[in-house]
Amino acid sequence: MEKSHRVCKNCVANHYWLHMDNHGKSFIKVMITDFKNGVTIPAKFARNFGGQMSGTVKLETRNGKTYEVQVAKELNNLVLRSGWERFASAYELEKGDILVFIYSGNSHFKVWIYDPSACEKGLPCIITEQLPRVQQRSISHNNHTQLKRNAKSAKLYVDSSGHSKETSEINPANSPSWKPTERVPSSEELDEPVDLANVQKATKSFYSLPRMCNMTSAQKAEVDALEKRIKPQIPFYITVMDKASATDGLLAISKDYAVSYLLDKNETIKLCHSGRSMTWDISLDIDTDDQYALSTGWLDFIRNNHLQEGDICVFEASKNKRGVALIFHPLKQSHHPKPPGCVPSTKFPRHGVSKPNYIVSRFTTLSGQLKIKVEAKVQAIQSEIPIFVAVMRESFIRGRSRYMCFSAKYAAKYLPREKNKIMRLRLPNKSYKYKAVFKINNKVHKLGGGWGKFVDDNKIKLGDICLFQLMKNKKKLMMMVHIIRKSEFC
């Protein structure tokens, strides 16, 4: 009887794996040990699916964002390796987190993420990061109009056919890196045979210039001469360094230009200098609003090439089987002084009322009563330095190793680069200062030791909002912390 029962169970298992539709089959992984560099696909799942998965799988999270991860065979195991670290970093995976991988065919998995409490990982009243933006019209040589709508700029581009196309800017980045010893690809290598079926030949460049910031006749002539000499198959991308490009670590790129001539997914591209032997690996980032920008690596590029606000940048795009490259062509007269009436880059709308000056934590957006409360508080604080807004999550307030993370955008611009400094925390109208250790681990900036005492003493709970105001002109690193209780908006 026992033997027949065992045989029956084996039959059911074989029927499940060999004869039933594979869509919806799943496996679970608990994040333990060295999970940030890769995770192993369970052996039983790998045995039954190994032949159906290509060398690359796609991981899709609940917010719809998809990541490509390489599957490596190591010691007879299938391991999610190249690309996994980026996925783990993007969703701030922590020890004890539980991930459910649900197969949906064609080497594609939907991934549900849970925290150690077995509840789906997420923030109260939070969906995904949404960056404020302003829209403006960009120009050809003879058309100089601009329309701003919010706080960052989206632009209209004029292509070679004379049709305008709309695109958008995005925000921020992590600290970049460049590789001075890498060889710059030759023009022959970059222009080796490629499939140009979807690439239109164009004789006119894409321009992205603010209102009234016209190029000089000499600059136009230099671009025209460059086009005639190089005869690019892909239009040049021409823009001007505004304040955000020079200081915020990003350069907005036309969505239409990026999709047509560069990439339509998050990827690293090679940035070269036409007259130097350096190359830089630059991230092309696409946010949830389909806004495109060059981010990680961009700051190093502008520092190494001494670019500044007002400089004209000419980029030549090139594609081959090995990837995408942008070649930077400096103009002899590259700097563009601001003429009277030129609209500078700004974080605020043009019509007098300033947008609340704050930065929210990653993958968060504020809406409803929460947004009203936060913006009212930020307006009341009137800080010159943007306020960092964080919604309290499990890892921030519970457990022995509690810590509070700052976004890479905020940290890169406003926080020190040295780790293990003491951060002093104060409440408004209180003189007592808490001491927490400011740490930097794997490019993650966070408050560690001492943060737990601040949480306990001030009875901070899951879903509460903390607004961190960096105090200016202080000899010691200090933040004023304003607290909005969850009960005030939910």
From Swiss-Prot:
Q: Which UniProt keywords apply?
A: DNA-binding, Nucleus, Repeat, Transcription, Transcription regulation
**Keyword Zinc-finger assigned:** no
Q: Which cysteines are joined by disulfide bonds?
A: none
Main location group:
nucleus
- Keyword Repeat, does the record have it? yes
The record lists the organism as: Oryza sativa subsp. japonica (Rice)
Polar residues compositional bias, start-end: 169-178
A GO CC annotation given for this chain = nucleus
Where is the region Disordered?
Answer: 161-191
Citing just one GO molecular function, the answer is: DNA binding
Q: Which InterPro entries match?
A: B3_DNA-bd, DNA-bd_pseudobarrel_sf, REM16-like
Cellular localisation: Nucleus
Start-end of DNA-binding region: 24-117, 236-331, 389-487
What is the name of this protein?
A: B3 domain-containing protein LOC_Os12g40080
Source domain of life is Eukaryota
